[in-house]
Amino acid sequence: ASYRRQRQMCIRDSHRGLHYLSNLATDNYENVRSIVQKFLRAEHEEEIVFTSGTTEGINLAAYAWAMEHLKNDDEIILSIMEHHANIVPWHFLRERFGVKIKWVDCDASGNLDPQAIIDQFSDKTKLVAITHMSNVLGTVVDVKTICHEARKRGIVSLVDGSQAAVHMSVNVKDIGCDFYAITGHKLCGPSGSGAIYIKQEIQKTMRPFIGGGDMIKDVFTDKVIYNDPPMKFEAGTPGIVQTIGFGVALEYMMSIGMDNIEMYESELTLYARQKLEGLNWLNIQGKPSKKGAIFAFTLEGSAHAHDISTILDKQGIAVRAGQHCAGPLMHHMGINASCRASFAFYNTKQEVDKLLSGLELARDLLS
């Protein structure tokens, strides 16, 4: 209803006019900040910065923090499981400043040992950027252990929570990270919405990311006085409608209860895992000990993932096919492309069974 009302009122700018509609837009928009704070269990509302999604959030961290603090031969630690959004921005620093990227592999089952990450820490390590849950393997990473050890050593930590925040309860204070990025479209919200948690003490060391209206207090011919966070990192007319819709979606998920969602999905994942692993002609990528509701797979033989996906689509089953924006992981596993089925709290065991029937049809048609 909030989303529809905002659309109907011509989407007036927030933080601009003094008239009723503008003030209403501002109130509705800013209310979402407290919703995200509650969802992530951040200590301060001001630690929530709105973005267009996880990609912008991580780039904000790269441009506004990392490019101000990292120099030649400084190190960034990444896992091989990272999404391109948590890889490419760090390559920018490698290309422009000579920063070194150190990679940590997962094991054959898709597990990522936090100690393997910690063992790569050195006096030159300035940042560890790690996924909370692999968007390909479903591996749930012990980011708390990694982030707490990083803090002891003065290393900044960034967590890509795009996948994990959908499936489990997140507490950024408990994790101990400095950045935690999420995206709205995976959380039942509109595309083009998202947020990044930035710890207050880190915000104080950051320069603005994008220049324009709202991120300033005043502008002169010879200087600019920047606004305080979080406005300092939110320039121009924001995605007002998208952000309000994002807030509505988060309230909906919290009304169900993230612990309830995690419990339901754990049972569904176990059911799907038993069924899929029972197909000896189906190759499942990664079988980590702690896994979210994500399964990447190929068929035995030469069947291409795109063909499998097309056949499943004809049966009313939507899967993704390709490299899933995780090229380094796919190269590491020696796979050109795979299909990925992702389950959520609105899926059922009957739909898992339908996937199995679709896979059997694909096998018959492509063998």
Task: Please report, for each region that a protein language model flagged, where it lies by residue.
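Pyridoxal 5′-phosphate
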Residues: R5-Q8, R12-S367
